[in-house]
């Protein structure tokens, strides 16, 4: 249960609170760009992913709603949904067990934080009149939240 609370506090409430803090400055300037990090788990659900998937589906819904609400203020909203990425997320998921975390990526090359950062940079460097609304990013071995080729 504590993990669920932390997950929802971080992925949903954190997104809402930070957005609430920065949006007034963007609306005052009549421009800005919000980039939210979702997950492929926010696009497709999978076994034993109920709380995590729900929190990432919320990121997707919040991003879509924000995009509509902020159109009149010329504020772009981009949601980036990475797939399997070799980050500290796996360590958290496996309670700090490095061996179990590393096994997740056996047989294929996952995304790395730098890959996601490059995509964020690209999205943020587009002209003001261009917005990537929704982007699903996976390694070439991954089709979606369900299918990853390990071989």
What are these regions (language model features)?
Residues 2-5:
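Substrate-binding pocket helix/loop in short-chain dehydrogenase/reductase
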Residues 19, 55:
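Active-site helix of classical SDR
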Residues 44-50:
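Active-site loop immediately N-terminal to the catalytic Tyr-X3-Lys motif
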Residues 79-80, 87, 99-145:
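C-terminal helical subdomain
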Residues 21-30:
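A short helix-coil junction within the Rossmann-fold of NAD(P)-dependent oxidoreductases
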Residues 39:
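Residue(s) in the substrate-gating loop at a strand-loop-helix junction
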Residues 21, 44, 65-75:
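Active-site-adjacent segment of SDR/Rossmann-fold oxidoreductases
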């Amino acid at each position: 249960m504590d993990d669920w609370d932390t997950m929802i506090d971080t992925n949903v409430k954190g997104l809402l609170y930070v957005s609430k803090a920065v949006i007034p400055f963007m609306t005052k300037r009549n421009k800005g760009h919000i980039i939210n990090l979702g997950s492929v788990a926010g696009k497709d659900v999978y076994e034993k992913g109920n709380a995590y998937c729900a929190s990432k589906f919320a990121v997707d819904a919040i991003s879509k709603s924000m995009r509509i609400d902020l159109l009149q203020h010329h504020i772009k909203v981009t949601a980036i949904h990475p797939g399997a990425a070799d980050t500290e997320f796996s360590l958290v998921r496996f309670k700090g067990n490095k061996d179990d975390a590393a096994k997740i990526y056996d047989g294929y090359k996952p995304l790395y934080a730098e890959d996601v950062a490059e995509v964020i940079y690209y999205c943020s460097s587009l002209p003001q009149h261009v917005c990537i609304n929704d982007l699903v990013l996976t390694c070439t071995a991954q089709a979606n939240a369900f299918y990853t080729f390990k071989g």
